[in-house]
């Protein structure tokens, strides 16, 4: 059966492919599968969490039709929110900094977000800069009434990662022993891990130091 017709581009989020690693895995070694999150519209798994947060806020009235959204970010979360808000018709105010990659900031602007840049000290990220960005986002939300997604505290994103766990479970037909995820805030690792453990109690989340045994030596 061919690909189904999508009603809008947001339906292209998720249901990404699993790809087996072959050449770098020892013969008769473990089967290692990669989840190709680059297949999401902006090339990032953050599309999932951005859509989940906006959908939940719309559903319970925190975000009215055409209502504004604000968030502090400098990376893929900002790009994904810019994308989702553009499709859904929500003006987006991003609080960011010159400490982040210019390409990411330009991507957000191209997708229609308004950026407020908090100056860094020497171009580097510091705890103070993070606090300043959070404070600035809170001020914008307070003054304008915009919905603040507040990614560090927003539990709505867990629904996206639980759904991703369901995808993995179905794609592997339940044949999975461990799950590894590169993380920033670790929300994805927590959410996917929780989802998988609903079906497979005892699933391992091995630390990176344990992975060497899966690879061929150079």
Language-model region placement:
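PLP-dependent amino-acid enzyme catalytic core
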Residues: 1-218
């Amino acid at each position: 059966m061919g690909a189904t017709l999508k009603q809008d581009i947001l339906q292209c989020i998720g249901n990404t492919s699993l790809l087996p690693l072959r050449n770098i895995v020892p013969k008769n070694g473990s089967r290692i599968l990669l989840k190709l999150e680059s297949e999401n519209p902006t090339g990032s798994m953050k599309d999932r969490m951005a859509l989940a947060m906006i959908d939940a806020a719309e559903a319970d009235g925190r975000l009215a039709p055409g209502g504004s959204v604000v968030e502090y970010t400098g990376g893929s979360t900002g790009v994904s929110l810019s994308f989702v808000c553009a499709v859904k018709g929500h003006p987006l105010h991003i609080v960011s900094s010159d400490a982040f990659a210019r390409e990411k900031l330009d991507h957000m602007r191209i997708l229609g977000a308004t950026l407020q840049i908090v100056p860094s000290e020497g171009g580097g990220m510091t705890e103070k800069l993070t606090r300043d960005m959070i404070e600035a986002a809170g001020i914008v939300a307070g003054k304008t009434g915009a919905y603040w997604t507040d990614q560090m505290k927003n539990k709505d994103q867990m629904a996206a990662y639980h759904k991703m766990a369901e995808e993995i479970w179905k794609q592997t037909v339940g044949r999975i022993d461990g799950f590894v995820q590169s993380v920033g805030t670790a929300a994805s690792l927590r959410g996917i891990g929780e989802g998988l453990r609903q079906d497979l109690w005892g699933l391992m989340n091995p630390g990176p130091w344990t992975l060497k045994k899966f690879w061929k030596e150079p």
